[in-house]
Regions:
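Glycine-rich nucleophile elbow surrounding the catalytic serine of serine-hydrolase chemistry
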Residues: 1-16
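Alpha/beta-hydrolase-fold enzymes
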Residues: 14-119
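Mobile cap/lid helix-loop segments that gate and shape the active-site cleft of serine hydrolases
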Residues: 108-144, 151-152
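Catalytic histidine neighborhood in serine/cysteine hydrolases
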Residues: 123, 169-177
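Short, conserved loop/helix-junction motifs that constitute active-site signature segments
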Residues: 146-149, 175-177
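Short beta-strand/loop motif that positions the catalytic acidic residue
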Residues: 149, 155-157, 161
Length: 177
């Protein structure tokens, strides 16, 4: 059994499709947690992913070799400003109140740097061009097809996820064989 969570989901789908094409299914089942493999309905995050934005991100990452986690967190926060930006500006900055500790706040601040090569490929090939879902992605000369995956697959989507919208997760879940 193998698990893919968030960005690990497209990577898992890619791996399973690659193995299936080579008749090398090494796993009995796979679980995808809030993970997209079809980015057609990827939601508001697609507002930040067009040719101009991708060029800017690529140039930014070329300097340091990674995307700083704080930048990624800022983009995610901008997807839900009513919940993740404005309460802190009003309560903390304007009213001088201390933020209440809660698990989402801690989790949201725990960002990870994204290696440039990985992030560039992910944004361009998955989000922008949706190659895996369209059957246009190749890995090592092997054309990938999610429909060739024959092991049992479980997908979990959460109702209010602003990064992996449930409609996108559901659409991708239907692509497996």
């Amino acid at each position: 059994t193998i698990l893919g969570y968030c960005i690990g989901g497209p990577l898992l789908g890619t791996t399973l499709a690659f193995l299936a094409q080579r008749n090398e299914e090494h796993y009995n089942s796979a679980t995808f947690l809030v993970a997209q493999v079809d980015f057609q309905k990827a939601g508001d995050l697609k507002l930040f992913i067009d040719d101009a934005q991708l060029k800017n991100i690529e140039a930014l990452m070329a300097k340091d070799g990674y995307l700083d986690g704080a930048r990624m967190s800022t983009v995610f926060n901008m997807l839900r400003p009513k919940d993740l930006i404005w309460p802190y500006i009003i309560n903390n900055y304007m009213l001088g109140k201390q933020p209440a500790a809660f698990d989402l706040l801690y989790w949201n601040q725990d960002s990870t740097r994204m290696p440039a090569a990985n992030h560039n490929y992910y944004l361009r090939e998955f989000y922008h061009e949706n190659k895996l879902a369209l059957g246009k992605m190749q890995l090592g000369g092997v054309k990938l097809d999610l429909g060739k995956i024959r092991i049992p697959v479980f997908h979990l989507a959460t109702r209010e996820d602003h990064i992996s919208p449930p409609k996108s997760v559901f659409t991708g879940a239907k692509m497996f064989g």
